[in-house]
Amino acid sequence: MNSLQSLCVLCSRLSECALELECLRFCDPVTLIPDMTNFRKNGVVIIHLFKTLFAELCHQNFNCASPVTIYLQILLKAMYNQVLLLDASIHQFLLDNDKQKYFENIFQLNECKQHLKLDLALNNYLTFSVDISTINDIEKLLCKMNCIFGLISPLDGINACSQIIEFLTILCGVCVVMKPEVFSETTTCLKCYEELSLVPNQGKSIRKRLAGKFCNHLTETHMVSNLEKNVDIIEKDLDFSTKQYGLVKEYMAKITNIFQQQLYSKPPHLQEAENTLINFDLFSKIPDTIYSLSEFTYWSKISESVIQKASITLNQLNLCHSLYADLQNEISKFLYGETIQDVFNFNEENVTNDDKLYIGSRFISPCRLVDIITNVSIKNLEEDPVFTKLAEEDEIQTKIKTLLNELENSAHETVPKKYVTHSMTQDHNLQQEIHIRKKAYYQKISESGYSKVMLCIKEQEALINKLMNINILGNHIFESLSKMMNAFANRQLQSLENFSADPFTYDDHLYIKNNLLSKKLPQELLPNLSQEMYRLLTGPLSNYHTASFPLSSNISMAYACDVADFLPHMKEDLAKCVEGTIYPENWMLCTYNKFFNFDGLHNINDMQRQMWNFIRELVLSVALYNDVFGKQLSIVKFGEETETVEKILLTFDSGSPLLFKRGTTTTKFNDLYSLLYFDLKTQCDPVQISQTKQVSHIPAPNLLDLCRQNENSIPECFYNF
């Protein structure tokens, strides 16, 4: 078993223990005191694991994070805190025997720690604060950090992610089941946007398309059904003596008998149609009437499935809740000698009926309640006079009955009946035509209104399902955190002092810059260079251009901007900046040793625009340099692996933003044009230059020392000066 497998096994075992530890919070402390020895043994194991692994996990995530290690760091810290809190609360309960105070301590009701004010520092020491209170806020902050990834120093970025992990420990605790107050079901995430990007937008903006969409990525909804029918599982867990105590056996029998009767039955016309169709199979001769009957039966079943009545009534669920509560009290009397009071029934008499509607029952599946609410809403709609009239004149039901009557009447006929008649053979009846058209118009209007109401009911049903069912913490937040932390870790320059320093002066910078200013960039290069700029600007969360089925870099950047709620005018500024131009004087704006320097800027928007300008100048200047001198310099982000021998590494670090790597030698630069001069100078071979005949050269290697082939065929007027 390798280390990753061992880590996964440990994570699985800890998750199992964490679930049991979370359940203890909801129990009556009276039930915990007799078994305190086992609790403390397990607590010692958790404390030992925390002291052994936690520091190493933090170090691992600081250098090379993964979703599993981040989750383990959160889980270990939360379990450690929970064990200490439980032990202290039980000890206090033994002294004062106050359950009210015990539950207040366990659930920390007198304090609120679910808020974080995160301070984020940028490259020019500009600091701003972000308020976080939900998982959605964390995901949105990561998306915004993704857009300004180049403006955040690696150390500040990793520290911010570490604070987020600490806050997740408080927010989530030991249980992966999320509390309703720690997430917003209608706030979408990056994955929601990715799903919408796969379907046509029908001319709607992304904000309109995302409005009303339920996010099932940050928290994944798990439907709980048939919880009330699992009395047989309880019966298997009880020993024989417990089953024979008091009314335990009687209560379990009553719960089992509640759901024996099913209230729903098919409509009579549908049952009769199915009995008729059962006589026809694949090899039978199918008359037109039978085919029509089958088709109308199909559509009738579809409509019945939409308005099908629930098989369990609200009275049955209320009775089930009462019987389960009585069964719990009987079992607790046998095991502990008294009726236990867990957190669910503690002060239950103070809960109003309206509150109970939101609280629900721990013995009843949320899906059952949602189904009942939905069907009651549909039933109330169908009792409206308009829809009652429509139900009486159900066209599909009428046609099925007509076809059944025709089949019965024509059972002894030898000649099949023709169902299609020519309209010109019928007498024209104006009043009948008006009545038919009016009825068709009313039918169309009614069906349209009914469809809209049904759509609204289904949307509300989806919302209630999201709220009432179990929501498990998804892995999307851990994946995003690990990607962000690894991207910052790759940018760390631990060995920066080992790199050679820039050996050139302002004259060298000016020499390259002045010579490039007299040239023009080929127009046909601009589209590819724009993609190159988008690639360098895109953060680690939206690198779709590196996927197995890659998208273009501009789409990756567009996704990042949309998810981070970029303002439209900022998107326009970015697009105009990246468009580029063939004239160097429009983009060569950086002064000597000021590349990626943001001094004097005190606004995030201005810093973003300045970063875009720096990236544009880097990409276009290197492209022009390659075109003029026949070079093949490439630009990559620091930490990315490429097979290129000569490359420029973009570090996004204000101290040393550029590194030039040739083979195993790396030199750091604060100036772009000094870097280009370094490449040009070190490529020249003075021995070859001195042996070249019939060509006049300046002794010192410089811009004019170009290597040409067949120089003897060049007229003297081009090189004699």
Curated annotation (Swiss-Prot):
Segments forming a coiled coil: none
Principal localisation: host cell
Entries under Pfam families matching the protein: PRTP
GO molecular function: ATP binding; zinc ion binding
InterPro entries to which the protein is assigned, alphabetical: UL28/UL56 (IPR000501)
GO BP annotation list: viral DNA genome packaging
Binding site for ATP: 625-632
GO CC annotations, alphabetized: host cell nucleus
Top-level taxon: Viruses
Keywords: ATP-binding, Host nucleus, Late protein, Metal-binding, Nucleotide-binding, Viral genome packaging, Viral release from host cell, Zinc, Zinc-finger
Zinc fingers (C3H1-type), renumbered ranges: 189-217
Location in the cell: Host nucleus
Family to which this protein belongs: Belongs to the herpesviridae TRM1 protein family.
Task performed by this protein: Component of the molecular motor that translocates viral genomic DNA in empty capsid during DNA packaging. Forms a tripartite terminase complex together with TRM2 and TRM3 in the host cytoplasm. Once the complex reaches the host nucleus, it interacts with the capsid portal vertex. This portal forms a ring in which genomic DNA is translocated into the capsid. TRM1 carries an endonuclease activity that plays an important role for the cleavage of concatemeric viral DNA into unit length genomes.
Oligomeric form and interacting partners: Associates with TRM2 and TRM3 to form the tripartite terminase complex. Interacts with portal protein.
Listed name of the protein: Tripartite terminase subunit 1
Organism of derivation: Human herpesvirus 7 (strain JI)
